[in-house]
């Protein structure tokens, strides 16, 4: 691995902290970053020590719980996929060997934002894509060759260790009910 970036909130650390790893052999080929006027433009401002400690603690705790967390999320992923496969009109966009934390599927007939709003009223929260592509069609789905309708009706589910089988049941019930209620709009 040459580079790795980590957003703290993705590993249950404080929002606003992150880490960047760059292999020495790669770092030597890069131009140094510039950060305004601090430290001759080579360093950012004052580090947020509590957040740095929080990221370290979250990383250590995450490492200790990694295997059971992966198994738990894999079980939730299988439960969701099995439930979605039973619903007419649903297309699973995530391949079987995709990362376990994310499942992407399309309804094929109901705009993503309409379905997101419907699920929100049931306290079920999903997205229409990744945060970095908010409001834009999914570049990933387009690159996979998905049809425009598939992309416009896609929903993205993200799992974490705090999710439960009951959460998946609530999501599946919401999708099932939403398919019935929203097709007539």
Placement of each model-derived feature along the sequence:
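Active-site PLP attachment segment
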Residues: 1-37, 44-57
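Thr-Gly-centered strand-to-loop micro-motif
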Residues: 6-8, 15, 42, 105-106, ...
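A general structural signal for well-ordered alpha-helical segments in protein cores
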Residues: 14, 48-52, 59, 77, ...
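Short beta-strand-to-loop capping motifs
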Residues: 22, 105-109, 159-161
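Structural signature of PLP-dependent enzymes
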Residues: 59-81, 91-99
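Conserved C-terminal alpha-helix-loop-beta "cap" of PLP-dependent enzymes
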Residues: 103-155
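PLP-dependent enzyme catalytic core of the Aspartate aminotransferase-like
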Residues: 139-185
């Amino acid at each position: 691995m040459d580079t790795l970036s980590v957003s703290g909130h993705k590993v249950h650390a404080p929002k606003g902290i992150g880490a960047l790893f760059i292999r020495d052999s790669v770092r030597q080929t890069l131009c140094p970053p510039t950060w305004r006027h601090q430290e001759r433009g080579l360093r950012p401002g004052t580090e947020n020590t509590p957040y740095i400690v929080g990221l370290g603690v979250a990383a250590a705790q995450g490492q200790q719980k990694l295997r059971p967390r992966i198994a738990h999320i894999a079980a939730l992923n299988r439960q969701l996929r099995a439930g979605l496969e039973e619903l007419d009109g649903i297309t699973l966009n995530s391949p079987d060997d995709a990362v376990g934390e994310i499942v992407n599927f399309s309804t094929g007939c109901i705009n993503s934002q309409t379905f997101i709003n419907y699920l929100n009223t049931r306290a079920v929260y999903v997205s229409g894509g990744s945060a970095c592509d908010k409001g834009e069609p999914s570049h990933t789905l387009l690159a996979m060759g998905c049809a425009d309708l598939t992309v416009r009706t896609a929903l993205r589910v993200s799992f974490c260790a705090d999710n439960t089988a009951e959460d998946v049941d609530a999501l599946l019930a919401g999708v099932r009910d939403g398919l019935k209620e929203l097709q007539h709009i």
